[in-house]
Amino acid sequence: MFLTLSIWSCEKDKTLLIKDIPDWLKTQISGLEQEIKADPNTLTVYSAWVRFEWKNNYYFEYLDPPRSYRSLPRNLDGTNINIEDLNNYEKEKCCMQYVWKAPKH
């Protein structure tokens, strides 16, 4: 039982609180949840939204492994990262946290 609680505690620390999720992302997540509810067999059940830190800012990425898709990182206001910054972002980003995980992610 202790091991289970420890794992749960670690996972909890890696998931953001609802107050830390920007409104534009809450809307995206709501749409994904509706899609999954309408079709439980959709590949969306394997997806997730994650947050990284880079240069004292937060960036959000949508991961969809079955479709080999990953969105461009978006900042807190939902704007995509500048393409010119993408290589440095990929090398320097840190501190991944799950924002939302679909049921089978």
Task: Identify what each model region corresponds to.
Residues 6-9:
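C-terminal motif of bacterial Sec signal peptides marking the signal peptidase cleavage site
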Residues 11-13:
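Bacterial signal peptide processing site
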Residues 15-43:
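Short, non-transmembrane alpha-helical segments in secretory-pathway proteins
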Residues 47-70:
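Exposed beta-strand-loop-beta-strand "reactive/processing" segments of non-cytosolic proteins
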Residues 68-84:
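A short, surface-exposed beta-strand/turn
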Residues 79-105:
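C-terminal partner/receptor-binding element of secreted or periplasmic proteins
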